[in-house]
């Protein structure tokens, strides 16, 4: 299949909600080695976000069941083995994406917004790995995630408008990283609030094309801030993340 056929197949897979097929098509497009267009970049991101999202959701449910079966050895063992199976799938998907990012996507990215998009993606997928990791492996994935987010953050601050949806999406996910992974609510709130305030101050720079995306992410930033600063917040806060 040539590139245009692979992209067409990815779009068809998306409409059929067959995200594993969509990811396989976009992986093949990426491995052709050319820089991806914005449309191709978004197709790749949506495909893997859905593929990994299904496993993250399953992992959380099974982990919760596993904890509730304490005292019932047989049921707990079954839950543990099933969690480990899902964990392996999740890790394989993340390693797949990180391989594409390191080999093709980050090195080939020319415009700053592409570089930020892919470095944010790198931060995201190391974050997903860290959610299921433990010990030295957890520390390594946390460090790699923070480094990727930080590099993306610095480029976005110097090269992109505060209202740019990719810059806002990065701030959203980086703040979730601080809150959930590093357990630093103050840093998470500070980052989210700065991103929101800077975007509000420059709302007049919003172009029509990205208005909807930018305002949606600003709302998510505000929702997280409200959640994080409320005194009655539960332990299992369901924090909003950027889709792309």
From Swiss-Prot:
Keyword Membrane: no
GO cellular component entries: cytoplasm
Keyword Transferase appears in the UniProt entry: no
Highest taxon in the source lineage: Eukaryota
Location of the protein in the cell: Cytoplasm
Keywords recorded for this protein, A-Z: Acetylation, Cytoplasm
Residues with site note (Interaction with phosphoserine on interacting protein): 56, 127
Pfam families reported for this sequence: 14-3-3
Gene Ontology biological process terms in this record: axis elongation; gastrulation with mouth forming second
Residues carrying N-acetylmethionine: 1
Assembly and oligomerization: Homodimer, and heterodimer with other family members.
Recorded family membership: Belongs to the 14-3-3 family.
Physiological role: Adapter protein implicated in the regulation of a large spectrum of both general and specialized signaling pathways. Binds to a large number of partners, usually by recognition of a phosphoserine or phosphothreonine motif. Binding generally results in the modulation of the activity of the binding partner.
UniProt name for this protein: 14-3-3 protein beta/alpha
UniProt source species: Xenopus tropicalis
């Amino acid at each position: 299949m040539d590139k245009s056929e692979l992209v067409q197949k990815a779009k068809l897979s998306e409409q059929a909600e067959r995200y594993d097929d969509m990811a396989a098509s976009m992986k093949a497009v990426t491995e052709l080695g050319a820089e991806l267009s914005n449309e191709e970049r978004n197709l790749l991101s949506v495909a893997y976000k859905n593929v990994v999202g299904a496993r993250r959701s399953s992992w959380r449910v099974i982990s919760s069941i596993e904890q509730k079966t304490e005292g019932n050895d047989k049921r707990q063992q079954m839950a543990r083995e099933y969690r480990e199976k899902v964990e392996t799938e999740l890790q394989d998907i993340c390693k797949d994406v990180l391989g594409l990012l390191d080999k093709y996507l980050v090195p080939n990215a020319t415009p700053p917004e592409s570089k930020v998009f892919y470095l944010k993606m790198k931060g995201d997928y190391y974050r997903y790995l860290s959610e299921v990791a433990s010990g030295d492996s957890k520390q390594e994935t946390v460090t790699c995630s923070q480094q990727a987010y930080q590099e993306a953050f610095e480029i976005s601050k110097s090269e992109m408008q505060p209202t740019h949806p990719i810059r806002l999406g990065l701030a959203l996910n980086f703040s979730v990283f601080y809150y959930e992974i590093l357990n630093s609510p103050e840093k998470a709130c500070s980052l989210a609030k700065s991103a929101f305030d800077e975007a509000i101050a420059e709302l007049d720079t919003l172009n029509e094309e990205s208005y909807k995306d930018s305002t949606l992410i600003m709302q998510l930033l505000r929702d997280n801030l409200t959640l994080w600063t409320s005194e009655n917040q539960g332990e299992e806060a369901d924090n909003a993340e950027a889709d792309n």
